[in-house]
């Protein structure tokens, strides 16, 4: 382990994570002022369903990519790296397209049966378009984590957040007069566009970095990639699928229970938006430190085990 690199990456990731969460919380205040507590409640329900699809698209891919690429660089000298990355990216894209198809074509069903609000369907379809991009980005982030080069992905995340905020502030006022459904659609459209731009930045950085890896130009075929990907990613994915499903069910049930208690679906959405949109964001703010350390330790432990 190169301690200087590890400490540098820890500082970069922790600082960026804190900055992103801080900017996000401040922006939530602006967003809540624009669309109201009820709009925040609807938006949170939309993201609840989206997060389930996001788990299907990305669970296990980033961790598997980090481990497999770290092992290849430690033992294989990078000769099979190009072939390995192609197969990992293809698997990521397939999962992303699968999740996108499920969410896009199941948007009406999810809006009616889970969210109990037909206004959510348009936003779910828009968000589905971002899933293939995010799935591929998850794999590329695993690549850069294995390379101990987190600067590019961190910069892309910062650019994504700032672009998302700028786009929301630009297009949201025009959608506010059309209803909460259209307002939420404007918010997620801005987020989807920002994801695509961020994905393009990371892809450009990956293509540039791969050429600099010693031995990567030989393009030696990597064998057993899918089997190895399954053995690493399946347990992680299964755990996250269960956790994400339970969280989705919980978040879907809470507004219904609040509606029974208050006697009003609108008031229930307002209370749910205040809870999930603001209070929980503040509560989970300190987890930035734990997430950073656990992420950075993975390639170090993998390399030590491989050697």
Kindly give the residue locations of the regions a language model identified.
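Helix-loop junctions and terminal segments of transmembrane helices
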Residues: 59-74, 283-307
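Interfacial/gating helices of multi-pass transporter permease domains
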Residues: 31-52, 184-185, 224-232, 255-284
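N-terminal membrane topogenesis motif
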Residues: 1-23, 79, 83, 219-243
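Short membrane-interface helical motifs at transmembrane helix boundaries
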Residues: 98-121, 175
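Interfacial transmembrane-helix starts/ends
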Residues: 7, 44, 77-94, 226, ...
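Residue-level recognition of pore/gate-forming positions within transmembrane alpha-helices
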Residues: 17, 21, 48-51, 87, ...
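Hydrophobic alpha-helical transmembrane segments
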Residues: 155-170, 178-208
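Alpha-helical transmembrane segments of multi-pass membrane transporters/permeases
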Residues: 10-18, 124-125, 129, 144-170, ...
């Amino acid at each position: 382990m190169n301690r200087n690199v590890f400490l540098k990456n820890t500082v970069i990731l922790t600082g960026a994570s804190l900055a992103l969460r801080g900017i996000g919380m401040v922006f939530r205040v602006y967003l809540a002022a624009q669309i109201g507590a009820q709009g925040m409640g609807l938006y949170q329900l939309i993201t609840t369903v989206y997060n389930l699809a996001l788990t299907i698209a990305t669970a296990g891919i980033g961790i598997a990519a980090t481990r497999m690429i770290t092992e290849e660089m430690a033992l294989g000298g990078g000769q099979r790296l190009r072939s390995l990355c192609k197969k990992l990216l293809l698997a990521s894209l397939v999962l992303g397209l699968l999740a996108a198809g499920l969410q896009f074509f199941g948007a009406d069903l999810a809006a009616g049966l889970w969210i109990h609000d037909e206004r959510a369907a348009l936003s779910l379809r828009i968000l589905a378009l971002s899933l293939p991009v995010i799935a591929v980005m998850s794999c590329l982030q695993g690549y850069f984590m294995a390379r101990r080069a987190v600067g590019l992905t961190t910069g892309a995340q910062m650019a994504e957040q700032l672009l998302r905020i700028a786009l929301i502030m630009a297009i949201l006022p025009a959608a506010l007069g059309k209803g909460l459904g259209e307002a939420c659609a404007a918010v997620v459209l801005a987020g989807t566009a920002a994801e695509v731009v961020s994905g393009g930045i990371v892809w450009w950085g990956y293509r540039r970095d791969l050429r600099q890896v010693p031995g990567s130009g030989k393009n030696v075929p990597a064998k057993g990639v899918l089997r190895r990907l399954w053995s690493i990613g399946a347990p992680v994915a299964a755990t996250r699928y269960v956790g994400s499903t339970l969280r989705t069910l919980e978040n879907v049930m809470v507004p219904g229970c609040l509606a029974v208690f208050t006697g009003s679906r609108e008031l229930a959405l307002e209370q749910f938006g205040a809870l999930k949109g603001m209070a929980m964001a503040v509560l989970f703010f300190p987890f930035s430190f734990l997430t950073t350390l656990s992420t950075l330790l993975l390639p170090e432990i993998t390399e030590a085990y491989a050697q």
